Amino acid sequence: MKVILLEPLENLGDVGQVVDVKPGYARNYLLPRGLAVLATESNLKALEARIRAQAKRLAERKAEAERLKEILENLTLTIPVRAGETKIYGSVTAKDIAEALSRQHGITIDPKRLALEKPIKELGEYVLTYKPHPEVPIQLKVSVVAQE
């Protein structure tokens, strides 16, 4: 019996894959649990439509990430902080950087996608990687300066 997988299953395959399974396994396990649907003509057409829509969404996200890359790689984000000689009081986190970018330039980014291994604790210039899309890494220049 041919079924279309709705969830990734270790021994069968990934989401959207059409696999051939024994009728009892499909009837008693896969179908009742919502892990698969029968591979009928209408379900196959729906799957193809869903794959096309997903590909279109991914292309749109990539194009949006490319536009964001052009903007972000040409600017330096300045973050004023209270500081001593070189050490700052507290630290600058990915969330602080995202808020400063939103406040200064009106650009909203997801702080979770900003590669910052540990919070910044010293004044200086930093180059961070932001990944809005797996194929589009963005180099963001951040300058942490003492507040006057």
Curated annotation (Swiss-Prot):
Matches recorded under Pfam families: Ribosomal_L9_C, Ribosomal_L9_N
Q: What is the species listed in this Swiss-Prot or TrEMBL entry?
A: Thermus thermophilus (strain ATCC BAA-163 / DSM 7039 / HB27)
Q: What is this protein called?
A: Large ribosomal subunit protein bL9
State the UniProt keywords alphabetically: Ribonucleoprotein, Ribosomal protein, RNA-binding, rRNA-binding
Asked if the Swiss-Prot or TrEMBL record annotates the protein with the keyword Phosphoprotein, the reply is no
Q: Which GO terms describe its biological process?
A: translation
**Xref: InterPro entries:** Ribosomal_bL9 (IPR000244), Ribosomal_bL9/RNase_H1_N (IPR009027), Ribosomal_bL9_bac/chp (IPR020594), Ribosomal_bL9_C (IPR020069), Ribosomal_bL9_C_sf (IPR036791), Ribosomal_bL9_N (IPR020070), Ribosomal_bL9_N_sf (IPR036935)
The gene for this chain is rplI
**Which family is annotated?**
Belongs to the bacterial ribosomal protein bL9 family.
